[in-house]
Structure formats: C-alpha cells, structure tokens
C-alpha cells in the first residue's frame, strides 16, 4: 500500500510568535479505507430533557440552581421510566374503560394522579391545569 501524504500544520501561513513551525512525526501509520476515504463514525444522539428541566426550574424558582447530579437524576426519571408513555397508556386505558375514543385532559389528570406518588401528583396536576388554562386563554 502506498503511504499517506504527510500533513503539515495549518496555522494560517504564520508561525506562532517566537516559534518555528514543527513538523509532525509519523508515529503509527494507519491504513486508509479501500475507497481512499476515512469512515466517519456517526455519533449517536442521546435524548435528554435537561434544558427543559432547567427552564421549568427557572420559571418556578428563578434564584435556585441545580447540580449536575440532581439534573441527571431528574433526567433519568423522565427518560428511563418513560413517564410520558406511562401516562399516555394509563389515559388510554381510562378512556377505554369509559367507552370513549378521545383522551381528554381529565384522563391525563387522572392518570397522573394514579402514576405519580402523593405530593408530586398534586404539584403535577396543579401545574398542568395552569398550563392548560394559559393555553386556552391565549388561543381565544
């Protein structure tokens, strides 16, 4: 196989002040892909809710911060337990029990009360009701 072309440092044609450009040494040669191009790894994107959690925190308590560990815990609560999926599934079951084909805010509210424990459910319901009221008033 033919060796790769030697790369030269790109500093915009200028060397840093007081230093001469240094040539890179060829330590370990790697072979190129058969097509002559390097294969790029696609970075898998992780879905996180960190920015949304932070925005809600700032709306509720503007002067309060959150540590990375606490953010990680809240993020895992939302993503790994699939809380949205659980609420939707429970709301679907409630609609089916009542022989209705539409999931309304009432089914969502009841499913949140069933899934989330105690005080957390109360806060979630009150914030959800507030959000629905705000949305309803803005669309008129």
From Swiss-Prot:
Q: Which UniProt keywords apply?
A: Acetylation, Chromosome, DNA-binding, Isopeptide bond, Nucleosome core, Nucleus, Ubl conjugation
Instruction: Give yes or no: UniProt keyword Disulfide bond.
Output: no
Q: Does the record's keyword annotation contain Transmembrane helix?
A: no
- One Pfam family cited in the UniProt record for this chain: Histone
Family matches, as Gene3D superfamilies: Histone, subunit A
Disordered: annotated span: 1-47
Q: How is it modified after translation?
A: Monoubiquitinated by BRE1 to form H2BK123ub1. H2BK123ub1 gives a specific tag for epigenetic transcriptional activation and is also prerequisite for H3K4me and H3K79me formation. H2BK123ub1 also modulates the formation of double-strand breaks during meiosis and is a prerequisite for DNA-damage checkpoint activation. Acetylated by GCN5 to form H2BK11ac and H2BK16ac. H2BK16ac can also be formed by ESA1. Acetylation of N-terminal lysines and particularly formation of H2BK11acK16ac has a positive effect on transcription.
Q: Which GO terms describe its cellular component?
A: nucleosome; nucleus
- Principal place of residence: nucleus
Annotated SMART domains: H2B
Do you know which PROSITE patterns this protein is assigned to? Answer: HISTONE_H2B (PS00357)
| Function, in words | Core component of nucleosome. Nucleosomes wrap and compact DNA into chromatin, limiting DNA accessibility to the cellular machineries which require DNA as a template. Histones thereby play a central role in transcription regulation, DNA repair, DNA replication and chromosomal stability. DNA accessibility is regulated via a complex set of post-translational modifications of histones, also called histone code, and nucleosome remodeling.
Superkingdom classification of source: Eukaryota
Q: Where is this cross-link: Glycyl lysine isopeptide (Lys-Gly) (interchain with G-Cter in SUMO)?
A: 7, 24-25
UniProt name for this protein: Histone H2B
**The gene coding this protein:** HTB1
UniProt-annotated location(s): Nucleus; Chromosome
Which family is this protein grouped under? Belongs to the histone H2B family.
Record cross-link Glycyl lysine isopeptide (Lys-Gly) (interchain with G-Cter in ubiquitin), residues: 134
Subunit text: The nucleosome is a histone octamer containing two molecules each of H2A, H2B, H3 and H4 assembled in one H3-H4 heterotetramer and two H2A-H2B heterodimers. The octamer wraps approximately 147 bp of DNA.
Positions of modified residues (N6-acetyllysine): 7, 14, 24
Q: Which InterPro entries match?
A: Histone-fold (IPR009072), Histone_H2A/H2B/H3 (IPR007125), Histone_H2B (IPR000558), HISTONE_H2B_site (IPR055333)
The species this protein belongs to is Phaeosphaeria nodorum (strain SN15 / ATCC MYA-4574 / FGSC 10173)
Name any one GO molecular function. Answer: structural constituent of chromatin
- Cite the PANTHER family for this sequence: HISTONE H2B (PTHR23428)
């Amino acid at each position: 196989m033919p060796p790769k072309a030697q790369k030269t440092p790109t500093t915009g044609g200028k060397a840093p002040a007081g230093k001469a450009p240094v040539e890179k040494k060829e330590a370990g040669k790697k072979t190129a892909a058969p097509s002559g191009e390097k294969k790029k790894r696609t970075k898998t994107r992780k879905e996180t809710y960190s920015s949304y959690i932070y925005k809600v925190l700032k709306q509720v308590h503007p002067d309060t911060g959150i540590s990375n560990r606490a953010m990680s815990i809240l993020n895992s609560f939302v993503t790994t337990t699939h809380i949205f999926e659980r609420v939707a599934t429970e709301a679907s079951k409630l609609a089916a029990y009542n022989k209705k084909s539409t999931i309304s805010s009432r089914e969502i509210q009841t499913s949140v009360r069933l899934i989330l424990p105690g005080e957390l459910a109360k806060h979630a319901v009150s914030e959800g009701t507030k959000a629905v009221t705000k949305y309803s008033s803005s669309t008129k």
